[in-house]
Amino acid sequence: VIGSPVGAYFVSGVKPLRLLVERKQARTAPGGTGEAKCGGNYAASLHSQIEAKARGCNEVLFVDAVEHRWIEELGGMNFMAVSRDGQLVTPELTGTILRGVTRKSILEVAPDLGLEPVERKIGIDELLDGVRSGEFPEVFACGTAAVVTPIGSFLDGDTEVKVCEPTGKTTMEI
């Protein structure tokens, strides 16, 4: 066991993230190590991370490697969305998404916060349309280092989609 002091995962603290939507480059593929915590998974996301930084984004939201339409996760964090009707929606585990401890914990406490946890496929277009319409007023990333970090906007190509409540009540409670 090695212990060392660390700072915040994001230097800016808990401020809403701006995400680059990555529709082409995959973080991992079926049959690989996507659900494991291993260096190769992070290395595969570096090219997209460099592009995200160059475009003024904090992180990358990856979709699946096969159809390029189903949300998977960020470079090193799981993804969750709060729906207008009280669901806490997160991509179902498919073998390409990290079985995050923080993700699991949030899903377990969701009912105590009045949320219905739902694990299912989430299409990237469904998400972006839902953010625009207010169906998903809050979205956030979560992970051991990143804890719960609100998402403020998505950059999809040249289109910016802003979240209605980037530091919403539910996200901050979680």
Please provide the spans of the model-predicted regions.
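Helix-start/capping segments and mature chain N-termini
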Residues: 2-174
